[in-house]
A protein has these predicted regions:
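C-terminal accessory helical subdomains adjacent to catalytic cores in phosphodiester-
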Residues: 3-167
């Protein structure tokens, strides 16, 4: 199995929620809007991300020749919203690379020591992001309204996917 995890970064929020502020020091996200120094560039980036996600969601896997037959290596795309720090730590500020890395290491250490906490956290992130019953529902929810700006994730579906319970 191949799994890929992406940040949503508000990609599916309506374009009119992107506001331009030339004096903004960095792109700022909230649950209802995105403020940036270059609105057109950010909208173009979001369009690229939406199109990329749309293409990846259509993939069921990768085909590989093995001997005389073709083998399917299953593939599935998962998300965190808005990003890892927002989903898992509730951080809404923009972090530099060093703080992102140290935060990820602390999370990994915490979850390694308490795997049940990891599972509980994934289920909580699923519930607060529309409480979808299926992987497909999770993506439909994430693509509606402002949900790609809200905290949440569909990573709770990784384990059932790897166990062969999701098709």
């Amino acid at each position: 199995h191949v799994i890929q995890i992406c940040d949503l970064d508000g990609a599916f929020a309506p374009d009119d929620s992107v506001r331009e502020n030339p004096s903004a020091e960095e792109t700022l996200y909230s649950t209802t809007d995105i403020v940036t120094t270059n609105r057109d560039a950010l909208i173009a980036d979001r369009t690229t991300k939406r199109n990329g996600v749309g293409s990846l969601l259509k993939l069921d896997g990768f085909r590989k020749k093995q001997g005389g037959r073709t083998v399917l290596i299953p593939y599935r795309l998962f998300y965190v919203s808005r990003n890892l720090e927002h989903a898992f730590r509730g951080r809404t500020d923009n972090l530099d690379a060093q703080h992102k890395q140290s935060g990820a290491i602390k999370l990994a250490d915490r979850f390694t020591r308490d795997p049940n906490l990891f599972s509980t956290t994934l289920q909580s992130l699923r519930r607060i992001h529309g409480n979808p019953a299926t992987w497909e529902e999770s993506w439909r929810y994430a693509m509606q309204d402002f949900h790609s700006l809200e905290r949440g994730s569909n990573l709770a579906f990784v384990e059932p996917y790897l166990a062969g319970e999701l098709q």
